[in-house]
Amino acid sequence: QKIYQDKSALNFSWYQKEPKFSLELIRSAKVATNDPIIDVGCGASVLVDHLIKECFTNLAVLDISANALASTKNRLGDSANNIDWFVADITQFDAPNKFSLWHDRAVFHFLTDHRDRKNYVKVLKNSLRTEGHLIIATFAIGGPEKCSGLEIVQYDSEKMIAELGDNFELVEERNEVHITPANKEQKFIFFRFLK
């Protein structure tokens, strides 16, 4: 949370001008434009801007940082009124409804304590509809070992499947080399699961 007080969103290593892989995987999921979608750990990401442009109308965003969400709200202007905003710790989130698609780029890998990961998966299972889509991206094996001074956990498909358990079927995975605003390379891995 403090990270967003100290930096502009454009300076975060995970910042993307266009969330290409996320958008491609969301399109692959073929959810209806009025299906409920949540972007977990959205921070100051522009994914929600792109989803609005693609006519998705039932959007929710969640972040632990009120500052990050305020920045995104300001950027969106009047469009922000049509989005559900949640300032919450995802490991303790109580969703008011079930989602058809859950998107997380770069939150799960910050959960270094197995209890936090277990709680995240519990919230995920309770919040995602049967036949719902999970799109989750983390640092890949061989990627960064820390991010913004924080420890992370690297993943491959085997590790991610072990974390999520039997309720989720891996549909698709993609590797990305993300170029940070400081022009450094970071290895990410994206997964799309079906519940």
Spans of features found by a protein language model:
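A conserved beta-strand element that flanks and buttresses the S-adenosyl-L-methionine
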Residues: H103
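Conserved acidic residues
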Residues: S100
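Short catalytic micro-motifs in class I SAM-dependent methyltransferases
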Residues: A106-F110
